[in-house]
Amino acid sequence: PDGLISPQAAAVCPDMDIIVAGTVGREDAAVMACESEKELLSRYPAFFVEEAKCLFNDGSMGEAAALARKSGVIYVHDVREGGIFAGLWELAASAGTGIDIALKNIPIRQHTIEVCEFFRLNPYMLRSGGTLLMVSANGERAAAALCEAGIPAAVIGRTTGNNDKIIRYDDEVRYLEPPKEDELLQYYKCINGGDYA
């Protein structure tokens, strides 16, 4: 990663807030919308596909990182290969903490969800370049500052004092698995085999 991003995992302790700035999955979703425009137009209106093609242009990582630091964020990491799930795993592993995440709180655009449903992919395992994963003792303050600047941000969970990496969706609890290959590779297998909806 470039100089904008400086993970400080040693400063991360249990009971800190985990924040996402930007929307997840947008980088790979935009790639898929550009490369499979014709296929997506068989299900979605043209304006929707055009918007999906521009998903990667919805925010400045540099501005978000600078604002976050001013708001007390101690860990900032660009969400890349393997998506937000890989980023969360790396955070927990490098900090030596557990994590407890509310899936519904992770910012994601409907366009990303629809593109992923079309190709039967997991949007939380897509590259999300330009989206930042952060940790702060006061996540609400950092998220509010980012939102005020027009950057979508939300507290998605907390670090914990054990090694469990928990993802919650309503009453369902699952445990995060070690990162696998980026879902974009599955997309290429899918389109090469014609195996999509």
Give the location of each predicted region.
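Helix-biased detector of long, well-ordered alpha-helical tracts
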Residues: 1-197
